[in-house]
Amino acid sequence: MLYENIKKLVQYGVETGLTPACEKNYTINLLLDVFKEDEYVEPEEEYRDIDLEEVLNALLDEAVKRNLIEDSVVYRDLFDTRLMNCLMPRPAQVQNEFWSRYEKDPQEATDYFYKLSQDSDYIRRYRVKKDQKWTVDSEYGKIDITINLSKPEKDPKAIAAAKLVKSSSYPKCLLCPENEGYAGRVNHPARENHRIIPITVNDSPWGFQYSPYVNYNEHCIVFNSQHVPMKIEKNTFIKLFDFVKLFPHYFLGSNADLPIVGGSILSHDHFQGGHYTFAMAKAPIEKHVTIPGYEDVEAGIVKWPLSVLRIRHKNEKRLIELATHVLEAWRGYTDESAFIFAETDGEPHNTITPIARRSGDMFELDLTLRNNITTDEHPLGVYHPHAEYHHIKKENIGLIEVMGLAVLPARLKEELELLAEYILEGKDISSNEKIEKHAAWVAEFLPKYDNLDKDNIQDVLRKEVGNVFVHVLEDAGVYKCTAEGREAFMRFINKL
């Protein structure tokens, strides 16, 4: 069995282009060594169209049988990453191939690198496809919803083992370039099959890679080669446009640099981008504005639940200057009547979530105004999902959500299935502790629907989840989409 599966894995490497045919013997020997095996008899059968997940599972079962690893998802993931690295080209080979394709066409280079990141199992296609995805129509356009199921749940044994591992600061975090080739440990994922493309932005060395969890098409991460914290400043806008000039078919955005309104990693300066058009990018300008000193720059308030100023120009340098002006003005801006405070007790509250893209021959920058103030009524944030929506989403509204994609917790899959059953059978939702938190929400929307049955219940639940997410985005908007909110927004713009 071992020989068969080794042959299949090597054949997969050759078929996908990870492994040159002339390196077959070399690769077989690397794999034998991982299994502490010094014999090999080539199976006669030829294999085609190999199912990677199947082959890896068979090899992992073999490793468990030989007591090479414990049988748990954490140890299996560490081990199969090591197996995949035996098939992989070295980092310099990947970089050379990338840049030689880039000379012909930047998109050809990213296509190659994206395919490699999937073929190598760094992006586990068979897990990513478990994610549930749908769209919901809203007054702001088609909103994307995804329930993230591609991150495996850790088992209790591995969690206990992770607690016993002495803490390490190598690599400092999951975004550090030192992850490339790292074997991992019980509390840090293996990254042996991970490859990074070095790029230069704002005259400094950065890295370009894909997210292993692919929330949308070609979801990439662009990160500082130094472990330095997130900071929104003039240089941020320069870096965003440097990248968009390198890869005109990609957008790139940054999470805000303050807690609550920022992303999950504030400790390492990074951006996220990709080859995807979000609802926010399609949203039209609701009101055109002219900013003194920047009359040549197209500017306007976007029809979007968050408060977004879109600026456009053929010369990105004009956008960098204007964005810096807006950022500095917003950082120091207070409007008590609109409950906008630049700071309280010396703690700053105002920042921006910026997103840069090409639009034909124009450069475009969306500046999303953010504020992280908290109150007794809203201890997690005034401009953050309010408590009534926490049953669906209570995590931060980061860059991806700002653009119109809800990344919802895995628990919702089971909860929505249970809700469907309880609604159709007329059972009391509040009697089940897993779904009681949804009872008030269901009671509110149920009267809108007459003939619910097993064929339409999931569609109704998905639509209502989408409606909740739109409300969550409205909560995160510092200026509401009302006459009063727009008036307050214009007060800020007139200060520019």
Label every PLM stretch briefly:
Residues 1-229, 303-305, 319-323, 329-405, ...:
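Active-site microenvironments that recognize anionic phosphate/pyrophosphate groups
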Residues 193-195, 227-252:
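Helical scaffold of the NTase/Pol beta-like nucleotidyltransferase catalytic core
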Residues 206-211, 236, 240-244, 290-297:
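Structured alpha-helical segments in the cores of large, soluble enzyme domains
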Residues 244, 248-264, 273-334:
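Catalytic or ion-translocation cores adjacent to nucleophile or general acid/base/metal-coordination motifs
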Residues 259-267, 345-351:
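Beta-rich nucleic-acid/ligand-interaction surfaces
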Residues 239-243, 325, 468:
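Amphipathic alpha-helical segments that form well-ordered structural scaffolds
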